[in-house]
Amino acid sequence: SNLRAPFVLTQEFAKQVPQAQEDAAGEPIASGLVINMLDQRVRKLTPDFASYTVAKMGLWALTQTAARGLAPHVRVNAIGPGPTMQGVRQSDQHFTRQRAATVLGRGSNPSDITAALGYFLNAPAVSGQLLCVDGGQHLAWQTPDVLGLD
């Protein structure tokens, strides 16, 4: 599932991670890193994808909770991609419109996602964070509040 597998995998991974090392200043440097793949929808909730969004919100809660509980040995962060790959039931036209409707007028590409991963790999003081790599889609999501329906 979107929640159970990451929960179990994080628990098992944490059992195997060595103790945190120390940097030159004597401060701990985590020896493990967990990256959960969320969805930018956790920043802009919509009832249109209720069960999926609830599962991803649970994973976001797990990310933050595990970041506290596994520190300082393991850092836990998340990436929230926007429209990156076309869904199997999604038309070319719909996917193109979805990407164009973001604030930046583009979706993300796999290289954008790996760049976000690279950031987390090289940022030892970052834990419990969500990096939305979505072309700003979470800022422009057409939810009822944006449409003036609530």
Residue ranges and their predicted role:
Residues S1-P6, T10, P47, A55, ...:
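Short alpha-helix in the Rossmann-fold core of NAD(P)-dependent oxidoreductases
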Residues R4, K15-A71, P83, Q137:
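Catalytic loop of short-chain dehydrogenase/reductase
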Residues T10, T63-Q64, T114-L117:
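Short-chain dehydrogenase/reductase
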Residues W60, L70-T84, V126-V133:
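Conserved Rossmann-fold SDR core element
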Residues A78-Q93, Q142:
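Short beta-loop-alpha junction of Rossmann-like oxidoreductase domains
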Residues Q93-D112:
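Catalytic Tyr-x(3-8)-Lys segment
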Residues P110-V133, H138-L139:
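C-terminal substrate-recognition "lid" of short-chain dehydrogenase/reductases
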Residues P144-D150:
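A short alpha/beta connector and helix-capping loop motif
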